[in-house]
Regions:
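Aromatic/hydrophobic pocket-lining residues that form π-stacking "cages" and hydrophobic walls in ligand
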Residues: 61, 87-89
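Conserved GTP-binding G-domain of TRAFAC-class P-loop NTPases and closely related GTPase folds
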Residues: 1-8, 13-16, 21, 25, ...
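Short, surface-exposed connector motifs at secondary-structure boundaries
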Residues: 67-73, 94-96
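Acidic, metal-coordinating catalytic cores used for nucleic-acid/nucleotide bond scission
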Residues: 75-87
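Conserved substrate/cofactor phosphate-moiety recognition/catalytic segment
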Residues: 13-70, 82, 112
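Conserved beta-strand scaffold positions in the cores of enzyme catalytic domains, especially
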Residues: 31, 99-101
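Short catalytic-loop micro-motif centered on adjacent basic/acidic residues
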Residues: 72-76, 101
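Flexible, glycine- and charge-enriched loops at secondary-structure boundaries
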Residues: 48-55, 77, 120, 124-127
């Protein structure tokens, strides 16, 4: 029984903070983060890069975690319904049997405020668009 926690939320909502807290409480879990993957592939988490390369690495890490039966956290915005469906489909295909979505529902004004304090800022119009999609 391999479990996946699918984090959902705006940039600045606290998804990565929640993931870090979960890993502290449950160190046997694995974190798969699209930001970390961007850092590995492109040298910077801020570099968007070709999505297909990021997705290939997500697939690889999902497969490894599922084969090893490691409970996993997937940290990405997952703002669009179709993106969440793709992640759930991939998770099932790679062997995850229990998939739980956790919506980190933070007020958009707070996400925008936090975003302004970050080194790696997401454009405000992008956050507002994601907010409408959620």
């Amino acid at each position: 029984m391999t479990k996946l926690l699918l984090l959902i939320g705006l940039p600045g909502s606290g998804k990565s903070t929640l993931a870090a807290q979960l890993l502290t409480e449950c160190p046997q879990m694995q974190l798969i983060s699209t930001d970390a993957i961007r850092g590995q592939l492109f040298g910077s988490q801020a570099t968007q890069g070709p999505w297909f390369l990021i997705w290939q690495e997500v697939e690889r890490q999902f497969q490894q975690a599922s084969i090893a039966n490691i409970p996993t956290i997937f940290d990405a915005t997952n703002a669009q319904r179709r993106n969440r469906r793709e992640v759930i489909e991939l998770a099932r295909h790679t062997g995850f049997t229990h998939i739980t979505g956790i919506w980190v529902r933070t007020p958009v004004w707070l996400c925008l405020t936090r975003n302004k304090k970050r080194d790696r800022q997401v454009p405000e119009d992008v956050i507002l668009r994601m907010h409408r999609q959620l």
